Regions:
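Bacterial N-terminal signal peptides
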Residues: 11-22
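Short, well-ordered, aromatic-rich surface patches in folded extracellular/luminal domains
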Residues: 26-38, 65, 89-144
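Bacterial N-terminal signal peptides that target proteins for export
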Residues: 2-12
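Exposed boundary/loop context
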Residues: 3, 16-18, 94
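Mature extracytoplasmic domains of secretory-pathway proteins
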Residues: 62-96
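Short, low-complexity, polar/charged sequence segments that are solvent-exposed and flexible
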Residues: 50-55, 73, 85, 126-129, ...
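N-terminal export/targeting and maturation segments
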Residues: 23-73
């Protein structure tokens, strides 16, 4: 009996290690990108989910458009270098929105089991890690 258990343990150990390592390294699936800008008069919310980008102004749906797969890949690749767990620690280049009436913004990434939110930042001057993503989302809603 001990020999059988030893043989099974020896043959199953590499498989268990492979399962554990591959499960640990694979990222969770991104479900939704939620970007919001608020200024003195208007609150704009951009929601990107399932190749659909929606624009809301003051909680009213203004526009909804389908995004091409190529653009989806660009958006997701721009997020690949960003660790979502550390999103709340992004360095804010400017805090002008606090005193000059500039629009303030916030990004929220929603995954299968967790969501991660950035600190509030100046909408015209996002953290360097988001400098591709934010303009891309705003441009896609205008183009489509």
């Amino acid at each position: 009996m001990t020999k059988v258990f030893s043989a099974l343990r020896g043959s199953c150990l590499p498989i268990l290690l492979l399962i554990c390592i591959s499960g640990f390294s694979s990222p969770e699936k991104l479900i939704q990108i939620h970007y919001q800008e608020v200024d003195l008069a208007v609150k704009k919310t951009f929601i990107y989910e399932d190749l659909t980008l929606q624009l809301f102004e003051n909680e009213t749906l203004i526009k909804s458009s389908k995004i091409r797969l190529n653009d989806d890949m660009k958006i997701r690749s721009s997020l690949s270098s960003l660790n979502p767990v550390l999103l709340h620690q992004l360095s804010i280049p400017s805090k002008k929105y606090r005193y000059d009436g500039a629009a303030m913004a916030r990004l929220k990434l929603v995954y299968m089991t967790n969501s991660f939110t950035s600190p509030i930042f100046d909408a015209d001057n996002p953290p360097s890690e988001l400098r591709y993503l934010i303009p891309k989302i705003k441009t896609l809603i205008q183009v489509n």
